Structures are given as C-alpha cells and as structure tokens.
Amino acid sequence: MIKLLCKTTAILSIALLYGCASAPSPEKMQAEVANYTLPKPAVADKGLVYVVRPSNVGMAVRFNVFLDDKEPVSEMGYNRGNQYIYFYVTPGQHVISSKAENWSDLPVTVKAGQVVYLKQEVNAGFVIARNTLVVLDDLEGRYLIKDGALGTIEKESK
C-alpha cells in the first residue's frame, strides 16, 4: 500500500511540474524558427489556419476541429498530443470549434494571404480532457508547429 501511495505521489508530482512548465523566451523561440519554413505555405487569395495542440497531456483523446459549424461535414481534422493540422479558409469572419469533452468556439477574422495560429489548450475534464482555443502570435505559432507532428487532416479547405 505504501509503495502504491509513493508511486501515485511521484506521478502526480511529475504531472504537476510538467503542467507548470513555461514557454521558452522569445529570443530562444526566434533563434529556433529563424530558418524554419511552415509545412504548408500561405496563398495569396485564401487565409491559412494552423491549429496546434502542443501538450501530451490526455494524448489518447482526440480534439476534433470544425470550421463555421459543428456538423460532421465541417470537420477539418483532429489532433492528439503534440500535433497540428492546417486548412485554408476564404477571407472573412469564421468560427473555429474544437471538440473534446466540451466545445470551444473561437471567432477569427482571416485576411487573404494571412496565417492564423490557434492553440488547443488541454484542461482537466469530468470524464475526458476538456479544451480551450486561444490565438497565438506568429512566433509562438511557428515554434509550436516546428516541434509538433502532423495530425489527421480530413480536408484542406471547405
């Protein structure tokens, strides 16, 4: 019983420390992405959206990404831990939705030729992981994509 308690305490301590890790400095991120090219480039007549899930917490749970509504035909793809997806959008106002235990909706305005970076933050859920979508700046977006793996892309545009 004591061994089990010690193991559980050790695992929870590691998880707590992992969750408190901070992002590297902007200087370090800039140095690491200086010569980095995005896997999919922007195009002149459309916007490009990258959705990244940099955390490995709850990686067995997939976070599905939808464009403009929550219908199955609007699913653009999904991420598991440390993955990203991308898709093109027509310029204008869109709502990106991410589904885990909950729905997280984020309205974004995308211009032609612009790249928008969104992060799926992992939160503790009642049964499975919950999520929150947040907008990233260009530097942090490129940094997180550089270190991620490609998720599952259902479609590259809608």
Where are the regions a protein language model picked out?
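Short loop/turn and low-complexity linker motifs enriched in small/turn-promoting residues
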Residues: 20-158
